């Protein structure tokens, strides 16, 4: 495994981390704790030290799995989680973006993750209006001062949300998470240069384009109802799979497509780490191999 500096945080993260939306049981698979424990044990053996999650991945389900799995090895892991999409009944409408409600989400995430601090706490795919909330960022920076959060981040919904990236330094944000992969590299045009100017760490999410760059899918692929990809229009999936298959024609015969896709992202000097999702140890190992290509 290779390691990269996470911007101005000074942290050194594995160039391949772990994304954990799948652990929220939203991607066609139900996980058990023993299975998750084995995945993280193998990840440690491979030198991976970064995991990204969110409170909305199964309403803390993913965080709970991670908290159990890392209970005895917390200090060697850099844990990133997110806020803003809490769907509990006591947080109706847009209230989950307000400072007092985000504070509740933070406490719930700390409890689920079984830790007294979160390394990177990220604003999760909100709007410009939701970002421009002085009370929210004042509260979050107080959590940094209190030691409950080490660094703040913004996970932008789309690369077009450059305003949020450009505001990072003023808000006390050190890390940006963005979509970046071989079929959607729009972030390279504006987002990544802004991150470089501000010395922000960058986490590249969906580096496998929702799994389509793994080479496992054909344009007529169907997904089970408990898989988020089933919620998309079939023609959208079909188009993305077709694009992915065209890109994968560039992959050498002796290289796994997913390894290549991770390595493709890591070619850009602004990228600190890629955070592909996984369902199995085999997928974990294939992704990790991308660090050495």
Which sequence ranges carry the predicted segments?
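Active-site mouth loops of central-metabolism enzymes
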Residues: 22-34, 88-103, 125-130
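Beta/alpha (TIM)-barrel catalytic core signal, keyed to glycine-rich beta->alpha loops juxtaposed to Asp/Glu
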Residues: 126-293
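Active-site groove signature of glycoside hydrolases
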Residues: 110-129
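Conserved, mostly hydrophobic/aromatic
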Residues: 6, 18, 36, 43, ...
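N-terminal binding-site loop/beta-alpha segment at the start of enzyme catalytic domains
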Residues: 1-77
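Alpha-helical scaffolding within the catalytic cores
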Residues: 1-4, 105-107, 163, 187
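A short, structured active-site edge motif that brings together acidic residues
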Residues: 76-88
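Short, acidic/polar
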Residues: 30-43, 97-114, 159-167, 261
């Amino acid at each position: 495994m290779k390691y990269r500096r996470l911007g101005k945080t000074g942290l050194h993260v594995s160039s391949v981390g772990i994304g954990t939306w799948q652990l929220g049981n939203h991607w066609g698979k139900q996980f058990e704790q023993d299975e998750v424990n084995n995945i993280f044990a193998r990840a440690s053996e491979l030198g991976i030290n970064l995991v990204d999650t969110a409170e909305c991945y199964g309403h803390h389900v993913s965080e709970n799995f991670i908290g159990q799995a890392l209970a005895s090895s917390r200090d060697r892991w850099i844990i990133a989680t997110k806020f803003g999409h809490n769907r509990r009944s006591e947080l109706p409408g847009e209230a989950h973006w307000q400072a007092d409600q985000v504070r509740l989400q933070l406490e719930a995430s700390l409890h689920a993750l079984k830790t007294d601090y979160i390394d990177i706490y990220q604003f999760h795919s909100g709007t410009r209006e939701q970002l421009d909330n002085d009370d929210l960022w004042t509260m979050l920076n107080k959590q940094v001062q209190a030691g409950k959060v080490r660094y703040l981040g913004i996970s932008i919904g789309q690369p077009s949300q450059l305003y949020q990236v450009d505001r990072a330094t003023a808000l006390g944000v050190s890390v940006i998470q963005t979509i970046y992969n071989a079929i959607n590299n729009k972030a390279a045009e504006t987002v990544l240069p802004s991150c470089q100017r501000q010395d922000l760490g960058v986490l590249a999410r969906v580096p496998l384009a929702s799994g389509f760059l793994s080479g496992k899918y054909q344009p007529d692929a169907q997904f089970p109802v408990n898989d988020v990809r089933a919620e998309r229009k079939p023609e959208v999936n079909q188009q993305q799979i077709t694009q992915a298959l065209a890109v994968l024609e560039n992959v050498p015969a002796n290289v796994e497509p997913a390894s290549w896709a991770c390595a493709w992202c890591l070619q850009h000097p602004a990228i600190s780490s890629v955070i592909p999702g996984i369902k199995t140890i085999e997928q974990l190992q294939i992704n990790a191999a991308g660090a050495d290509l």
